[in-house]
Amino acid sequence: MLQVYLVRHGETQWNAERRIQGQSDSPLTAKGEQQAMQVATRAKELGITHIISSDLGRTRRTAEIIAQACGCDIIFDSRLRELNMGVLEKRHIDSLTEEEENWRRQLVNGTVDGRIPEGESMQELSDRVNAALESCRDLPQGSRPLLVSHGIALGCLVSTILGLPAWAARRLRLRNCSISRVDYQESLWLASGWVVETAGDISHLDAPALDELQR
């Protein structure tokens, strides 16, 4: 059985400021650095053999902290990037016009083929993050990889493993530096292939950050 751990990056400056990040970037806050160190301590106990990370700055930094604790090299994979949020990237959420807010809401309310202008659809996101996960099956026998990615990207990945369409209403909360695990297995009582073992575990964090849309 292949076990793959999924970690969302630590809290960033734009998370704290309620700005839309997408594939734009901002650095980890002091709290985000602390979260990354806490998840690294947890990861060290899991026997991680490979760290595969989105190549955006916030995931790079989170992955670096985890890699140092685990003694692993990092493989960067652009397929693990966050959803491209087009013309709304870098914008403060409270500054959006009614039309712009409607574009944003399409990504979370189950709108088929919803997308922000110049951005990605949830199906496009799903195709690439699932392809990145499938690549883990090519690792040597006995590998235990950890993927560092983003909130919407990982939420979409876990939801599609559960059989939901990529564009389904977003109902899975994955906080900064939460840990999820998915397994590839053959089972008598589960569908063959990928299954979700756990999602959004934050028991290793002292004080989880609020999601940027809850502030």
Swiss-Prot record:
Domain of life, per lineage: Bacteria
Site (Transition state stabilizer): H150
Cellular compartments per GO CC: cytoplasm
Binding residue positions for substrate: 8-15, 21-22, 58, 60, 82-85, 104-105, 151-152
Cited CDD domains: HP_PGM_like
Keywords: Glycolysis, Isomerase
Annotated TM spans: none
Active-site residues, record numbering mapped to chain: H9, E82
GO molecular function, one term: phosphoglycerate mutase activity
Catalytic activity: (2R)-2-phosphoglycerate = (2R)-3-phosphoglycerate
GO BP: glycolytic process
Family the entry assigns: Belongs to the phosphoglycerate mutase family. GpmB subfamily.
NCBIfam families for this protein: PRK03482.1
Protein name: Probable phosphoglycerate mutase GpmB
